Amino acid sequence: MINLIRTNSENKGFIDLVKLLDAELAALDGDEHVFYAQLNKTDTIKHVIVAYENDTPISCGAIREYSPTTMEVKRMYTLPGHRGKGIATKVLNELEKWASELSYQKCILETGWRQPDAIRLYEKNGYSRIPNYGKYAGIANSVCFEKEITG
């Protein structure tokens, strides 16, 4: 059984999963990883979801405020052996629910062109592509999305 918990970036399960995520992204991004790493600091994230299976952390995601009306989805990751089972969708849905409870109106996010599974996840969950925003503007490997979460 999958159990989702709301926590923050000090959660050990989240920290362990993010280390695995960073290693995977370093292999995918190559020389560009240094640029992306500076945008993915996790030390002050207040809103984190960790999915556990039998007390083992298997998936995570986070949101942080981008603007007074918008949360940015960050650090989405699922262990390779647990992918394709809908766990990331559950984490994403819980993040959106949390953002809505906090009175935010939409979520935005950035992922990489080298991550087709992530792109499919966001598209199948109702995210629409938008021009690259903020520090991702002009970055060829980035693809950005948004989704209205109130309605």
Which positions does each model-derived feature cover?
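Conserved acetyl-CoA-binding loop-helix of GNAT-fold acetyltransferases
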Residues: 78, 84-97, 124
